[in-house]
């Protein structure tokens, strides 16, 4: 994946690599990139606080944008940490599958980890 991104901008590299991977029908790369981008989206979520989760309709948030939640801006170090965690989870999954005697099933998470590692390395070189 060779997404053009600003120096050190790992999120931009993840996003930039997604469309070419989809066009190439590279399922492993698409899965790795989508998963990492989703993990970043989750990390940006701000806890909803004291908004009621259920109850009377008059307490419900209604209208355009009512379901939107505030987001926080992740630093480049935080983005890198989230992607590194995604790599670690895939390596762990591959190891578990191999330990269960299913080495072929461990190839996919290992390949996804390699995609993300490559982007992490490229982002470090650009920084």
Where in the sequence are the language-model features?
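Charged, compositionally biased, marginally structured helical/coil segments
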Residues: 1-127
């Amino acid at each position: 994946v060779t997404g053009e991104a600003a120096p050190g901008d790992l999120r931009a590299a993840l996003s930039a690599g997604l469309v070419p991977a989809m066009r190439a029908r590279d399922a492993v790369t698409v899965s790795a990139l989508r998963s990492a981008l989703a993990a970043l989206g989750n990390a940006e979520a701000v806890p909803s606080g004291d908004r009621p989760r259920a109850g009377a309709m008059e307490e419900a948030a209604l209208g355009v944008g009512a379901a939107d939640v505030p987001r926080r801006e992740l630093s480049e170090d935080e983005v890198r940490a989230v992607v590194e965690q995604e790599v670690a989870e895939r390596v762990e999954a591959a190891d578990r599958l191999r330990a269960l005697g299913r080495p072929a099933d461990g190839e996919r998470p290992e390949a996804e980890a390699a995609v993300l590692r490559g982007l992490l390395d490229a982002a470090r070189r650009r920084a």
